[in-house]
């Protein structure tokens, strides 16, 4: 045998010494004699080692026992650490649950203004389907003007509502009767489950809807066991044969493949990183054993079903079978069919690869494989297998956004929530938040804005890129029913309804007129205002000379017509007579919280407000002088359904009823004969709607704010870069408002007459009293004692004279 230079010969004492040096780490034992004897076998080596007293010194049984004990202590410590992690996770809050937000529930009661077609749209939005099959929740049937609906169970703020089988009768455009078919008695009120509109998610953007094991269909559990872990109920967390296969695969560089039990999968997803190493696999095995040691199979299975990843919706991760059922099938987990359950279980292996929307054939093959495995285990009869395999995938269309279809509204909700809750609580405590959003109103607002802006751009060739915003509220209680933050209502970016602060123009004029009408001894709707040239001088700034939009002056103008036609000069002179401070103070009382600049130009709207701020101001007018803070939230419940906070109605009367009633009458004149007369193209005059147009310098901003008997809406139209839009309030925002209200079928505006207000016939030209049969006479409201006492000469028209004769004849 050829000896390498400097090498110790195997079998020699030098070989033993070198081996000892490597074992002990002591270089004193190194031996490197090139002339050493060689040729001895392994027995000689062993003999040499045994003879070395130094080796016996370094490697005694006592030392080996100490090393073993140290390793056992390390393993025990590591096991205790893992045990702490397992118990802490399972016995504490297992999941960071997002806050879940819901729209208003549809409340059904006799007399409700609702058409059968509108009800069908509502049911479709909620995922209810035809035909009716027994008492299965989420189903309905229509029989002419009658409906049978099995309403889903739901936990509301005032308690849990069980599943209910309802019978509804319609008469015309309203609901005439509501009956509970199970108890065979009429109901005064029934609710449908509310529409889920979005969530406030944890930082990792995981979303899930927790379910209890008893809420999971048995066939889904069977499918999971059949395809993922047949011995789940027999093993103690690991499957030795599968584990051996996985270990060999990892050791040979083929990665960890198969062999994982459901418990191991849960541990891997719940605690560990996705790396594929033996160290991680060993940790996974140890933790799986600990989980099985402390918790029963039902608890493990329930946690698994809530944890498993089942898809992606934009930046939102879909976790758990509860949310996956809603995401893929649009219905609660309890309502899943056998093939739907098998499809979900099949996706566990690879939610992206088996995505039924992107890869329907793969998903179908995987589903059928799951069904076949169930049949092998005699979980299905042959007929059940055949029927399930022939069923379509029946997956709903994917939502257009990853978080919510109503981002602008949810932006408002989040801002209001942050006044009362910490961000971490909103992202992890699983709060149930009931909002004021009305999906019908929201959809109508979005469609109206999109439709009318497109029409404006088509009519004005070369004009593109117009933007807009809409806010709609309930007149009576200030609940925000819709918020549209831009032309693309689903864009989760700049929210113009809340953050676009633009000059409001003539929308601020009603504040001046309200201020005047608060002094009935000086101003009434019939008072003549001076609309002649005005020069206002203030120290330190250039003279201010307001002009009217039509570039003309109109002399003596009745107060109500000065507002109806939005005359700038008459309005500015009126505001200056009252005093700038009084007008701006009343703006604050109406609800404008922003500091307004104390300049004369502010009287004509040289003030920047967001559409939501304008809405708050007009809300106080529409509610008769009662300031009602706008609210987007009704109730907040814990994840367990316990009340946390109720957002009660806060009302403060900030103006007497009489001047607000008079102002409302003047705003109705804006619609009937003023700058908003164009609304007649959209809505019938008998509705007596009230509103105000707003136009800013160089036609940069187009505004309209108006209200009916039940709703208030504010619309802004313009460009984001503040360039001129070439639109007045009447040509831009008003058509959007009119289209919206036409879709919503508003109630007439008929505010009650205050006790201290009377109606008097007035001559429009002079502002003096007149007989109602006189030409040019109009009936106006006055605070009692403020109407003019002097009468104008009556120039009776033949028509009015004849009508008066007939009236006196039959009185």
Predicted regions and their residues:
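A penicillin-recognizing enzyme superfamily signal
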Residues: 435-460, 470-474, 483, 489-495, ...
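Short, well-structured active-site flanking segments
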Residues: 233-243, 318-321, 381-385, 491-494, ...
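Active-site loop and adjoining helix of the penicillin-binding protein/serine DD-peptidase-beta-lactamase fold
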Residues: 209-215, 288, 292, 348-366, ...
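Juxtamembrane regions of bacterial inner-membrane/periplasmic proteins
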Residues: 46-458, 479-481, 532, 561, ...
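Flexible glycine/proline-enriched surface loops and loop-helix/loop-strand junctions
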Residues: 104, 203-208, 283-288, 321-328, ...
């Amino acid at each position: 045998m050829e000896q390498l230079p400097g090498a110790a010969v195997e079998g020699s004492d030098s070989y033993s010494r070198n081996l000892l040096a490597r074992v002990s780490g002591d270089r004193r034992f190194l031996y490197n004699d090139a002339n050493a004897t060689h040729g001895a076998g392994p027995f000689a080596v062993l003999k040499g080692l045994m003879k070395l007293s130094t080796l016996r010194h370094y490697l005694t049984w006592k030392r080996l026992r100490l090393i073993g004990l140290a390793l056992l202590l390390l393993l025990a410590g590591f096991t205790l650490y893992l045990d702490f992690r397992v118990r802490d996770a399972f016995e504490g809050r297992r999941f960071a649950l997002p806050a879940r937000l819901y729209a208003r529930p549809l409340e059904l009661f006799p007399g409700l203004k609702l058409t059968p077609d509108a009800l069908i749209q509502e049911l479709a939005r909620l995922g209810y389907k035809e035909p009716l099959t027994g008492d299965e929740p989420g189903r309905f049937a229509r029989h002419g003007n009658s409906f049978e609906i099995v309403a889903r169970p739901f936990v509301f703020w005032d308690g849990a509502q069980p599943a209910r089988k309802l019978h509804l009768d319609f008469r015309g455009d309203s609901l005439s009767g509501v009956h509970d078919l199970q108890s065979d008695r009429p109901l005064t009120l029934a609710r449908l489950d509310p529409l889920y509109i979005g969530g406030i998610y944890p930082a990792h953007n995981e979303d899930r809807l927790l379910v209890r094991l008893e809420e999971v269909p048995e066939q889904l559990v069977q499918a999971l066991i059949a395809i993922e872990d047949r011995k789940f109920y027999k093993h103690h967390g690991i499957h030795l044969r599968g584990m051996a296969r996985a270990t060999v695969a990892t050791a040979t560089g083929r990665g960890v493949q198969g062999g994982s039990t459901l418990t191991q999968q849960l541990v891997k997803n719940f605690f560990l990183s996705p790396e594929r190493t033996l160290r991680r696999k060993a940790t996974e095995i140890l933790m799986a054993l600990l989980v099985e040691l402390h918790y029963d199979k039902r608890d493990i299975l329930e946690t698994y079903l809530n944890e498993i990843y089942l898809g992606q919706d934009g930046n939102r991760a879909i976790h758990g079978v509860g949310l996956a059922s809603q995401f893929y099938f649009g219905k609660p987990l309890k309502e899943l069919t056998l093939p739907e359950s098998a499809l979900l279980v099949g996706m566990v292996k690879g939610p992206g690869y088996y995505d039924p929307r992107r890869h329907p054939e793969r998903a179908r093959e995987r589903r059928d494989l799951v069904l076949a495995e169930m049949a092998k285990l005699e979980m299905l009869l042959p007929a059940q297998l055949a029927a399930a395999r022939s069923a379509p995938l029946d997956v709903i269309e994917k939502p257009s956004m990853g978080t919510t279809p109503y981002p602008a509204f949810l932006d408002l909700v989040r801002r209001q929530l942050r006044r009362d809750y910490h961000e971490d609580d909103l992202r992890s405590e699983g709060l149930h938040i009931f909002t004021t959003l009305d999906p019908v109103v929201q959809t109508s607002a979005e469609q109206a804005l999109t439709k009318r802006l497109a029409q404006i751009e088509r009519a004005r060739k070369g004009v593109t890129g117009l933007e807009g915003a809409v806010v709609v509220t309930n007149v009576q209680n200030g609940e925000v029913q819709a918020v549209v933050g831009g032309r693309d209502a689903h864009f989760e970016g700049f929210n113009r309804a809340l953050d676009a602060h633009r000059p409001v123009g003539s929308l601020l004029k009603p504040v001046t007129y309200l201020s005047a009408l608060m002094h009935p001894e000086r101003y009434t709707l019939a008072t003549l205002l001076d609309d002649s040239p005005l020069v206002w001088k203030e120290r330190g700034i250039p003279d201010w000379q307001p002009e009217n939009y039509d570039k003309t002056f109109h002399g003596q103008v009745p107060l109500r017509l000065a507002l109806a036609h939005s005359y700038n000069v008459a309005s500015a002179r009126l505001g200056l007579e009252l005093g700038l401070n009084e007008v701006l103070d009343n703006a604050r009382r109406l609800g404008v919280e922003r500091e307004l600049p104390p300049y004369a130009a502010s009287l004509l709207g040289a003030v920047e407000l967001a559409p939501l701020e304008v809405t708050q101001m007009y809300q106080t007018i529409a509610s008769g002088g009662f300031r009602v803070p706008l609210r987007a939230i009704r109730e907040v419940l814990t994840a367990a359904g316990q009340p946390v906070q109720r957002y009660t109605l806060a009302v403060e009367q900030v103006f007497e009823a009489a001047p607000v009633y008079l102002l409302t009458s003047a705003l109705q004149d804006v619609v009937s004969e003023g700058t908003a007369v164009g609304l007649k193209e959209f809505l019938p005059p008998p509705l007596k709607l009230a509103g105000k147009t707003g136009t800013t310098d160089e036609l940069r901003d187009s505004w309209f704010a108006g209200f009916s008997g039940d709703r208030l809406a504010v619309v802004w139209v313009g460009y984001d870069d503040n360039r001129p839009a070439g639109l007045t309030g009447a040509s831009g925002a008003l058509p959007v408002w009119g289209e919206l209200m036409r879709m919503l079928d508003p109630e007439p505006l008929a505010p009650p007459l205050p006790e201290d207000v009377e109606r008097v016939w007035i001559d429009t030209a002079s502002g003096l009293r007149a007989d109602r049969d006189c030409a040019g006479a109009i009936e106006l409201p006055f605070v009692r004692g403020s109407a003019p006492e002097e009468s104008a000469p009556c120039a009776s028209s033949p028509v009015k004279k004849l009508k008066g004769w007939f009236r006196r004849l039959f009185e």
